A protein has these predicted regions:
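Active-site-proximal helices and loops of the catalytic beta/alpha 8
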Residues: 1-54, 125-154, 163, 184-187, ...
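Carbohydrate-interacting/catalytic domains
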Residues: 96-97, 109-116, 124-235
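Short flexible/disordered coil segments
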Residues: 25-30, 49-67, 175-186, 227-235
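A generic structural motif
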Residues: 16-18, 81, 219-222
Length: 235
């Protein structure tokens, strides 16, 4: 209600954030919920909007603590933050680092402005305020924290250099319980983003709009794929 002509240009999109947290942290929440929330925001604010898509916030428990199961979605995260130090220094389940990178990758590749809450770039733990305001750490990082830091830096560097991610159309390619794929496209420059919540590898055949593309696709991380100008096969 505060975003519009003569008002604010943008604010935190908590509707998308809350659904993103549930989707990436919980195995029982499918990507349909997140895609619906994102499409609803596009309806209200437009695809090329100035809304901020956040990794965390001082009014929420840390995502990684939800993802690791160190704090429950059913409990009051603010009370938890006052009564105990959630997760101590690192999450109890280190697969939560991978889930956090998925959340950050989502924010970095959708329209809008990606925003990192301090500490999320290394996966700091914590409940709600004041437990999510711990002192920032810059040294003695674990292997999981180093991985999150390196991939976050790569994602943000890519975001800053990609016209498709900054200005491109948003086209969903696959929206399922465990798999989410979409295309960002800007005048022949395309970026395909794929998320997989399955515990094992999956092979996807994605139909892409036929057009002349500038150059070939390259994997940002270690993903494997093949491509023939209209179909992208991702392993």
């Amino acid at each position: 209600s505060y975003v519009g002509s003569g008002q604010m240009d943008g604010q935190f999109d908590f509707n998308v954030y809350d659904d993103a947290v549930a989707t990436f942290a919980r195995p029982d929440v499918g990507f349909q919920r997140l895609n619906n929330s994102l499409e609803e925001s596009f309806h209200y604010y437009g695809v090329h909007n100035m809304m901020s898509y956040i990794s965390g916030n001082q009014d929420r428990a840390r995502f990684i603590s939800y993802a690791a199961g160190d704090i429950s979605f059913e409990e009051d995260s603010k009370i938890a933050g006052w009564k105990r130090k959630v997760g101590e220094r690192k999450p109890s389940d280190e697969t939560a680092y991978d889930k956090l990178i998925q959340l950050i990758a989502f924010n970095a590749t959708i329209p809008g402005i990606p925003v990192l809450y301090y500490g999320d770039e290394i996966g700091m733990t914590g409940g709600n305020d004041p437990d999510n305001r711990r002192m920032m750490r810059f040294q003695d990082l674990s292997e999981g924290e180093k991985m999150v830091k390196e991939k976050t830096a790569a994602l943000m560097k890519f975001r800053k250099s990609s016209m498709a991610l900054m200005y491109g159309d948003f086209i969903p390619l696959r929206v399922e319980n465990k798999v989410y794929a979409y295309l960002r496209s800007y005048f022949g420059q395309d970026v395909v983003v794929v998320f997989n919540k399955e515990p094992e590898e999956v092979t996807l055949k994605l139909d892409l709009p036929q057009r002349d593309r500038k150059g070939q696709f390259k994997a940002l991380f270690e993903g494997r794929f093949s491509y023939d100008n209209s179909k992208l096969i991702v392993d």
